[in-house]
Swiss-Prot record:
InterPro entries: 4-PPantetheinyl_Trfase_dom, 4-PPantetheinyl_Trfase_dom_sf, ACPS, Ppantetheine-prot_Trfase_dom. GO terms for cellular component: cytoplasm. Signal peptide: none annotated. It catalyses: apo-[ACP] + CoA = holo-[ACP] + adenosine 3',5'-bisphosphate + H(+). The keyword NADP does not apply. It is found in: Cytoplasm. Transfers the 4'-phosphopantetheine moiety from coenzyme A to a Ser of acyl-carrier-protein. GO terms for biological process: fatty acid biosynthetic process. Pfam families: ACPS. This is Holo-[acyl-carrier-protein] synthase. GO terms for molecular function: holo-[acyl-carrier-protein] synthase activity; magnesium ion binding.
Length: 147
């Protein structure tokens, strides 16, 4: 294991941010993530904000695991700052069975490999778990390496 990240989101506060006029919150998600959150909300008869909050917790967890992996390798340079992290290019999408998966856009994946000095024979692997209960959404992400 190279890195571990965890995040907790207050769903009510997150929903309020989503509803604010001019909010940037919706730009943090890809169209595919928004479609999946909407579909899941309609199936589960709950709010779309709940599912987006869980995806947001997972995205934060992914970035935290990435940063921990850098620290573990003695790397102090960060590929992105808080202001320029390409959040919508780090997707949390459900597979055919409904399990969450991390899908990075090609340029983000390249940056991940570059920042961690990944060799051609290795491949970064993400594991993510999402949960929500009441007004709290939570996620854990683990970054591993397949040799």
């Amino acid at each position: 294991m190279l890195g571990l990240g965890h995040d907790v989101v207050d769903v009510g506060a997150f929903a309020e941010q989503l509803e604010m006029p001019g909010t940037r919150m919706t730009r943090l998600f890809s169209a595919r993530e928004c479609r999946q959150a909407s579909l899941r909300a309609s199936i589960k008869h709950d709010g779309e904000a709940l599912h987006l909050a869980a995806k947001w917790a997972a995205k934060e967890s992914v970035v935290k695991a990435w940063c921990e992996a850098l620290v573990g390798r003695g790397i102090t340079e960060r590929p992105y700052t808080v202001d320029d992290t390409p959040w919508s290019r780090i997707e949390i999408v459900d597979d055919a069975t409904g399990c969450p998966r991390v899908v990075m856009a090609a340029e983000v994946h390249v940056e991940l490999c570059r920042s961690l000095a990944v060799t051609e024979s290795a491949e970064p692997v993400w594991h993510v778990s999402i949960s929500h209960d009441g007004g709290i959404a939570s996620a854990v992400a683990v970054l591993d390496m397949r040799e």
